[in-house]
Amino acid sequence: MPNDQTHPFRGVNALPFEERYDNFIGGEWVAPVSGRYFTNTTPITGAEIGQIARSEAGDIELALDAAHAAKEKWGATSPAERANIMLKIADRMERNLELLATAETWDNGKPIRETMAADLPLAIDHFRYFAGVLRAQEGSISQIDDDTVAYHFHEPLGVVGQIIPWNFPLLMACWKLAPAIAAGNCVVLKPAEQTPAGIMVWANLIGDLLPPGVLNIVNGFGLEAGKPLASSNRIAKIAFTGETTTGRLIMQYASENLIPVTLELGGKSPNIFFADVAREDDDFFDKALEGFTMFALNQGEVCTCPSRVLIQESIYDKFMERAVQRVQAIKQGDPRESDTMIGAQASSEQKEKILSYLDIGKKEGAEVLTGGKAADLGGELSGGYYIEPTIFRGNNKMRIFQEEIFGPVVSVTTFKDQAEALEIANDTLYGLGAGVWSRDANTCYRMGRGIKAGRVWTNCYHAYPAHAAFGGYKQSGIGRETHKMMLDHYQQTKNMLVSYSPKKLGFF
């Protein structure tokens, strides 16, 4: 059973999972109604690593039963008490950081250096952040006249559904769970079937800190478990992170029940480098080269991946000579080794999708500057899902510039001036992220305001602090993740309009 001690950690090379995971419902481990399980594999080697509950509508109903049974008491729990529980969750995660980071690496294939330095610290910080935000949240009082006052209260929605992706399994769960739980809601969460195990390690670790029914985790496939959750008339909100096509379906399901949605969907983010970045060979230029190479972070499996690079034509040759060298210096290898920079794609299906786009790019006439094929790392890793970091040169009308690949692939083109850079940057269906690099603050400001995207990194990229709003324009989504505004997204506002006058209005 979970306890307040550090859980045994046997090293990053030791499998961190149980042989089989049931669903976590009402504070207990509950076998799937059908009795069926599916096989989970690790992207590192392609080997089978355990069995996961294959849930259906009946399991979702059990989780909703538990959530509804808990919602009144949890919603009435004081903000101070809820915040203290959030802090305890963060503390226990921090004490078991190596265990959780290892579980993420085995489950997703990303390097242990990233899960240790980014995924888990960020996840922990989100619980602490929303504990603080909750304690600081205030209602309001409006004086209408001498005898009439309007009170405004923040109240939880009740029971909410959340569906998380496979690229940052635990971090994306914490992005959604922290504000929802802080706001006083009970949650039914469905992980991605590609990465179902790491979140269960986490649930086993912290599950006893929350009252039964506040957190419920049901594994399974999209149509079998995700659809029944998203279309249920027993949830007051659905939050989803994933592909835009699936997001449209989620929105359709929600519309049938007239419930709010938060959708964090696809992207094709431009990363724009102006000529002055190469004016000097200094720390800033080195930082810009790292910014270019950020397309390979997390194996390119990031919704904001800077997968389109725009370089001012006057510095193209100089910049790209150094950029290609930087990419070729990336160490690809066993994700469990601390010096590995890029690991495995999350699934064999994703690997095949990326390979198909490498073929598309070549057929479109794009020039391969480096990479362009699968990586065979030999030994036990030969069964894993590895792709070489790839740079294409082409133009923005190509499919590799317009369609989300979700892999370590970047497509590079040039621009003459700010106007052309802005035109190319905005020539996309998406609007999730963007990067602007320049030594000129005016250039950065004008470009940042002109780009139609929800997050514009300026002289940086892939930073995800809790106190910065994250979300998309256009077909990249609806609503925001992170930032204190997320607390409002999981609450509803009650207005009490109170008259203290003994006098009638006089209409009747």
UniProtKB/Swiss-Prot annotation:
Alphabetical UniProt keywords: NAD, Oxidoreductase
Active-site annotation: 264, 303
Recorded catalytic activity of this chain's protein: acetaldehyde + NAD(+) + H2O = acetate + NADH + 2 H(+)
EC primary class: oxidoreductase
Keyword Oxidoreductase: yes
Listed CDD domains: ALDH_ACDHII-AcoD
InterPro entries linked to this entry: Ald_DH/histidinol_DH, Ald_DH_C, Ald_DH_CS_CYS, Ald_DH_CS_GLU, Ald_DH_N, Aldehyde_DH_dom
Enzyme Commission number(s) of this protein: 1.2.1.3
Presence of keyword NAD: yes
Function recorded in the entry: Catalyzes the NAD(+)-dependent oxidation of acetaldehyde to acetate.
PANTHER family: ALDEHYDE DEHYDROGENASE B-RELATED
Family, similarity comment: Belongs to the aldehyde dehydrogenase family.
Name of the protein this chain belongs to: Aldehyde dehydrogenase
Organism: Paracoccus denitrificans (strain Pd 1222)
